[in-house]
Amino acid sequence: MGLRTLIAHALGRGTNTERPKAGQVVRPMAADRWRDYPADGLTPGRLVQILREADDGAIDRAMALYQQMEEKDAHLYAVARTRRLALTGLSWQVVSAADVHDVADRAGADEAADYCRKILSGIEGFGDALEHLSLALGRNLAVAENVWEFAGGELRLVDIVPVAFERLTIDEVGKLRVLTEEAPYDGIELPPNKFVVHVPHAASGHPMRGGLLRASAIAYLGKHLAMKDWLVFVELFGMPVRIARYEPSATPEEKRELLKMLESLRSDAAGVFSKAVELQLMEAGHGKTPPPYERICEFFNRELSKAWLGGTLTVETTGAGLERSSGGPGVHNEVRLDLRQDDITCEARTIRRDLLGPVARLRFGERVPVPCFRRQLELPRDRRELSEVLGRAVNELHMRVPARWAHETLGIPAAGEGEQVLSETVGAT
């Protein structure tokens, strides 16, 4: 940015951009090592209670429940990770506001983008922070702290630290607060320009009424109860029912002793009985219809897949008649493009508002065009067809196609200065 532009931004610097506090606000506490396990022995009544507590602002048990749900359910873990990796697996870039919006100060917008790009590239934990923010796709809330330090006489962003979910709470009026050593119970209000707050799918303005894990809780509970009954059934499946008949004159002590002998048959498969005892073994596991537990679990798995990925064919084809179909492998482990695009848009809006905005305005002033955060969404393309389209667009329609974009799209690196290049006649016949 030229001297004239820098002076203009400095003179136009408003008072809306408050200087954030240097250092880190959320520091480790002894209570951080404590952990709750609300998913253990979960019942419908307890689930309703936890969700209502979250609606009232006490979100710690709900967050612990969501974490346990992913840890204990392999299918839920798989679809949640697939959805998040569809976002975090894409490369990111900071683009000038002039490339997205019509701005008067093109030079200022480009300079702000270069500065923000340099700052983020120098933060080693920025990728980890983005992965932490992607957890909001399930919990619908994720927070990271911007750590500022004075360097060269100015306040500069030096780190972005994820904030543990146990440190978050919501007050009576619905405002997010963070628990600190000074305020371990009620928390403090989030200082301006100090935190990145990602709430991708808030319902009715309340972050706890949205989120995929809340929608997945009922499916998780139903599957959990079915699995519990299924394991009990598997333990008994194939083992004969042991029945012993005793004489009417048998004493209570003899009856108890006989019961112990029957129980020993379960594990030891051996026992000693009197000749007067009639022992009968009834073989189990040969009913006309199989137990419904597997069908129940498959139903809830399909519900989870639809909620997270937008369909069921993206994770499973067995049982759907597509084991040998050409359509089965083509959709395996994919997220619907409209869902991924929505995740990209929500993330970009949060990063621009809570991260790039403060970084740019604290450096160049309130009027600087804030750069944009983008994910490079790579759609499958036929390179031969794309080459033909580019040829027509440039030669016939005279469109101004950026050379850098063409190189990236075609997967052909740009030649360096002084590097030998192929001539235009290569491949000609």
For the regions a protein language model found, what residue spans apply to each?
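Structured, contiguous alpha/beta core segments that scaffold functional sites
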Residues: 2-82, 103-265, 275-276, 416
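Detector for short helical micro-motifs
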Residues: 83-86, 95, 304
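Short, solvent-exposed polar/charged micro-motifs at secondary-structure junctions
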Residues: 153-158, 253-257, 281-284, 378-388
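Compact mixed alphabeta submodule
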Residues: 181, 187-188, 291, 295, ...
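A contiguous, surface-oriented mixed alpha/beta subdomain in the mid-to-C-terminal portion of proteins
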Residues: 223-357
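C-terminal helix-loop subdomains that flank or include functional centers
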Residues: 299-429
